[in-house]
Amino acid sequence: MWQLLSPTALLLLVSVPGTHAEDPPKSVVILDPPWDRLLEKDSVTLKCQGAYPPRDDSTEWRWNGTLISNKASSYSITDATVGNSGEYTCKTGLSAQSDPLRLEVYKGWLLLQAPRWVVQEGESIRLRCHTWKNITIQKVQYFQNGMGKKFSHQNFEYHIPNATLKDGGSYFCRGIIKNYDLSSEPVKVTVQGSKSPSPILSFFLPWHQIIFCLVMGFLFAVDTGLYFSVRKVLRSSKEDWRNGKVTWSRDPADKGG
């Protein structure tokens, strides 16, 4: 005996996971070396990480939204100029377009570099005092919020292995280049606190799941009520039929028959 699906069953069928295609993962732009702030004449290679179809590694590169003719999985910039600054994105054959990566090229003698300007508590901070064309620099010192930190007679990278909130702030480096005392522009380093979810809040479901459960409960109650009501009527009609209690009415026009 064929039966129509109830609203609850239809809702369950529509909400079954996997009944619709999920969005492909995003491609990712990686820098080599990992500095997103450069001086003129520097070189950098942008690499696109993502899934490719078999025998097809063509990549779509964009600079400030404009398509770049390069279709290789990597894009190299040599002898960088200020004009190379901007947002770069990439897209592979089986991955969605990446989030934009901002690259900045500056004119000057000295520049502070870091692979990341935003870190979580417990992660490492790595700072580099970079000179134009890697010219020798001496008596290098790093500063945080105007206060001198580490000092060396030779150039070096400043590492903070386990960052805390107090390690965030404005940083710059200073040194001697060809008898000139030079300083880089300050850059903000952000240390974000670890977010541990509250046990009470984590117990509750997301709002859309709560609404779904409420709707499901309402439809189930309606379906159950309709089911028992129809069943009662059908059972009563069946008993009347068996007991001969069914009354047939005649059309008034048939009185003379």
From Swiss-Prot:
Domain named Ig-like C2-type: residues: 25-104, 108-190
Domain of life, source organism: Eukaryota
Disulfide links within the chain: 48-90, 129-173
Glycosylation sites: 64, 134, 162, 181
Transmembrane segment boundaries: 210-230
Pfam families attached to this UniProt entry: Ig_2 (PF13895)
Site (Important for receptor turnover): 223
Cytoplasmic side: 231-257
Subcellular location field: Cell membrane
GO cellular component: external side of plasma membrane
Ranges per topology, Extracellular: 20-209
Database matches in PROSITE patterns: IG_LIKE
Effect of mutating residue 55 to G: In clone 284.4
Signal peptide: 1-19
Membrane topology category: Single-pass membrane protein
Tissues in which the UniProt entry reports expression: Expressed in polymorphonuclear leukocytes, pulmonary alveolar macrophages and peripheral blood mononuclear cells (at protein level). Found in spleen, and at very low levels in lymph nodes but not in thymus or liver.
InterPro entries linked to this entry: Ig-like_dom (IPR007110), Ig-like_dom_sf (IPR036179), Ig-like_fold (IPR013783), Ig_Fc_receptor (IPR050488), Ig_sub (IPR003599)
GO biological process: antibody-dependent cellular cytotoxicity; cell surface receptor signaling pathway
Gene Ontology MF annotations: IgG binding; IgG receptor activity
Keyword vocabulary terms for this entry: Cell membrane, Disulfide bond, Glycoprotein, IgG-binding protein, Immunoglobulin domain, Membrane, Receptor, Repeat, Signal, Transmembrane, Transmembrane helix
Result for mutant: residue 186 to A: In clone 334.8
PANTHER family given in the database record: IMMUNOGLOBULIN FC RECEPTOR, LOW AFFINITY IMMUNOGLOBULIN GAMMA FC REGION RECEPTOR III-A-RELATED
Subunit structure: Forms a heterooligomeric complex with ITAM-containing signaling subunits FCER1G. Interacts (via transmembrane domain) with signaling subunits; this interaction is a prerequisite for receptor complex expression on the cell surface and intracellular signal transduction. Binds the Fc region of antigen-complexed IgG.
Function in brief: Receptor for the invariable Fc fragment of immunoglobulin gamma (IgG). Optimally activated upon binding of clustered antigen-IgG complexes displayed on cell surfaces, triggers lysis of antibody-coated cells, a process known as antibody-dependent cellular cytotoxicity (ADCC). Does not bind free monomeric IgG, thus avoiding inappropriate effector cell activation in the absence of antigenic trigger. Mediates IgG effector functions on natural killer (NK) cells.
Name of the molecule in the record: Low affinity immunoglobulin gamma Fc region receptor III-A
Species for this entry: Sus scrofa (Pig)
